[in-house]
Regions:
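A short, Lys/Arg-rich alpha-helix, primarily the initiator
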Residues: 1-17
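Structural motif corresponding to the intra-repeat A-B loop/turn of tetratricopeptide repeats
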Residues: 18, 122-123, 160, 190, ...
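Short alpha-helical DNA-recognition segment
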Residues: 19-38
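DNA major-groove recognition helix of helix-turn-helix/homeodomain DNA-binding modules
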Residues: 47-64
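Amphipathic alpha-helical segments of tetratricopeptide repeats
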Residues: 96-101, 133-139, 171-176, 208-219, ...
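Residue register of alpha-helical TPR repeats
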Residues: 111, 148, 185, 225, ...
Length: 404
């Protein structure tokens, strides 16, 4: 049992779903407000007579919910499989909404809320706090469902850049987990968070563990996600050859389904990025064009394309790409870099204007705050400083680069 008194939980859910206040139910049943409140909190168990009165008001039957309980258990099992195999799980929200009136009378209703919570977390929806609080108030900390809850709570914390909290939650989830597939998912999420914390070797170890489990159970899309993350670790460590090999291996293994085409586009973009870091801008440009066929108008691909054309001194083509993608000026993720690249293209290979230098500093400093500053950000800034003859600032940023 996940509560001392599941009937109280069922009464509360049905009452709220039907839009009744406690006072309204009290007046309709003749049961005092205080006693109803105790029923819902689970501090007092209602008699059969009281349950019957409440059922009549809410127009429900709590006596026979076994079929619905089992249906919800089956739905949760199916949902967990969809996560493990990286299937589209958005349809669960529509399914839940169309069956909520049936589900809400079940003592397993918290599992429905958990499915909704995870789908919303994965979709990066902001409004999940209410769901999170409701689940936390009803789920038992010894249950395997609690492991799933704190795992995706950690995923949400990671998206908010609360890395320490995310790590702590995942360590707790690892202790509770007793299923190999669950372990694989936790390893995967732990590897991603460790990567964000720049703990690259720990991230690598966890991703390798996760990949082993995904391969064992034929979850090749998840396995590919591990390869992408491992490739990113190689990039961070400056092992561009290993990164390209890892990405290329996975690219060859992918099929032509919609999900795998999206993954191919990501791989092409990542390979383009590696070639940019290796200063092979022609090779990078070819890879970007392949990515564009699969996923046009991607912000990163657009920026990579502008940069490659700029470095190849094809300013006319670069400017055309800028004109065709003015929407990035309004995108908070890409805006500052898009403006910087626009300035660079307008300056061509001549002495950079002050606005270009200021924008390069702005981009670099912002990325530094977010812990995203990388080789290219330094390269752009240092190139501009060299052309501007800003000796003092050049030395300052070169010292920072040496430390990084």
């Amino acid at each position: 049992m996940f509560m001392r008194n599941t009937i109280g939980y069922q009464i509360k859910n049905c009452r709220k779903y039907k839009g009744y206040s406690l006072q309204a139910v009290s007046e309709a049943t003749g049961i005092s407000f205080v006693r109803l409140s105790k029923f819902e909190r689970g501090t007092e168990k209602p008699t059969a007579q009281n349950i019957n009165k409440i059922e009549n008001v809410l127009m429900v039957d709590f006596s026979n919910t076994d079929i619905i309980d089992n249906e919800i258990n089956a739905l949760m099992a199916e949902f967990k499989e969809s996560i493990f195999y990286l299937r589209n799980n958005n349809y669960y929200l529509d399914l839940i909404e169309s069956n909520r009136e049936r589900y809400v009378i079940s003592s397993n209703y918290y599992k429905i809320l958990l499915i909704e919570y995870i789908v919303n977390v994965l979709a990066n929806y902001d409004d999940v706090i209410k769901l999170e609080n409701e689940i936390e108030a009803t789920i038992n900390h010894s249950m395997i469902d609690f492991q799933l809850f704190i795992e995706y709570r950690a995923v949400r914390k990671h998206s908010m850049k609360q890395y320490d909290s995310a790590m702590k939650l995942l360590k707790e989830a690892l202790i509770i987990a007793n299923d190999e597939k669950n372990m694989g998912m936790i390893y995967y999420h732990y590897g991603i968070i460790a990567h964000s914390c720049e703990q690259y070797f720990e991230a690598y170890d966890y991703l390798v563990k996760a990949k082993y489990i995904f391969d064992k159970y034929y979850s090749y899309l998840r396995s590919g996600k591990c390869d992408l993350q491992i490739g990113n670790i190689y990039i961070r460590l400056g092992r561009y050859d290993l990164a390209l090999n890892k990405l290329n291996e996975w690219l060859k293994a992918l099929k032509d389904t919609k999900e795998e085409r999206n993954l191919k586009a990501i791989i092409f973009r990542n390979m383009a990025w590696v070639n940019i870091l290796m200063r092979d801008h022609e090779a990078a440009l070819k890879l970007i064009k392949e990515a564009e066929k699969l996923s046009p108008k991607n912000g990163n691909a657009i920026l990579y394309k502008i940069w490659c054309l700029y470095k190849l001194e094809d300013y006319k083509s670069a400017y055309k790409v800028i004109l065709n993608n003015k929407q990035l000026e309004k995108d908070k993720i890409y805006r500052d870099r898009f403006i910087l690249f626009s300035y660079l293209v307008k300056d061509r290979n001549e002495h950079p204007r002050k606005r270009t230098l200021d924008q390069a500093k702005k981009v670099y400093e912002q990325f530094l705050i977010e812990k995203k500053a990388g080789v290219l950000d330094f390269t752009i800034l240092i190139e501009i400083l060299e052309k501007s003859n800003e000796t003092k600032e050049l030395i300052y940023y070169l010292k920072i680069k040496a430390k990084v």
